[in-house]
A protein has these predicted regions:
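A short acidic, helix-capping loop that chelates divalent metal ions and anchors anionic groups
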Residues: 85-86, 174-180
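Charged helix-capping and loop-helix junction motifs
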Residues: 130, 184-185
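Cell-envelope and extracellular/periplasmic
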Residues: 171
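Short, flexible helix/strand-to-coil boundary loops that buttress conserved ligand/catalytic motifs
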Residues: 78, 181-182
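Conserved Radical SAM active-site core
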Residues: 27-165
């Protein structure tokens, strides 16, 4: 039986065993499951300006983490080698939310201010971002989200209480351009998000 994923505007109707357009969400026994939860493809200590957030704790560094999966298909994506893979293709290392938060805290001596969820579209696996962000907050550190902005209001409501700064990476300003990138029903998305 098909199930509908409600994370983004695509509202993928997935048969059992089928991945959504993002490559990170899958119908498993009638439930939409986040296949990239804790499956890390990239982890680095980056300057905050690389996010790019030049006015948010300028001169600091932040532990940047990413997985696989993206709900847009931009031909100019600088991280396509990780963001466009699905669970069956991506090379990953599992890192529990607690371990990520602990690692971020241990890097304070090097100037780390928290965790940035980046490199792919992190909200294809928003459950991991939410769970990690809660723990990062308990350590008194910051959470930064680098996103394409294509997520549902329900996802937004579950995450925003834990996010300190966000960069919404606009790809263009016209509906027809976003359609080329795979972002359908732009009017509804803009209204919802």
């Amino acid at each position: 039986m098909k199930e509908t994923c409600t994370v983004c505007m695509h509202r993928c109707r997935l048969k059992p065993g089928q991945f959504g357009r993002c490559g990170a969400r899958k119908n498993v026994n009638g439930m939409i499951v986040c296949e990239n939860y804790g499956r890390i493809t990239a982890l680095a200590l980056d300057p905050i300006e690389k996010k790019p957030l030049s006015m948010f704790y300028p001169g600091s560094v932040i532990l940047s983490v990413g997985s696989f999966g993206c709900n847009l298909h931009c031909p100019f994506c600088q991280n396509h080698d990780i963001s466009m893979k699905n669970a069956d293709e991506a090379e990953t290392v599992f890192l529990a939310p607690e371990k990520l938060a602990l690692k971020a805290s241990e890097l304070r001596a090097r100037g780390n201010i928290g965790v940035a969820y980046t490199y792919n579209e992190p909200l294809t696996g928003y459950e991991y971002v939410r769970d990690a962000a809660k723990i990062v907050k308990q350590y008194g550190m910051k959470n930064v989200l680098v996103t394409n902005g294509a997520f549902s209001e329900a996802v937004e409501e579950s995450l925003l209480p834990y996010i300190d700064a966000m960069n919404v990476d606009l790809k263009g300003i016209r509906e027809d351009y976003y359609r080329k990138l795979g972002r359908s029903e732009e009017r509804r998305v803009g209204k919802e998000c």
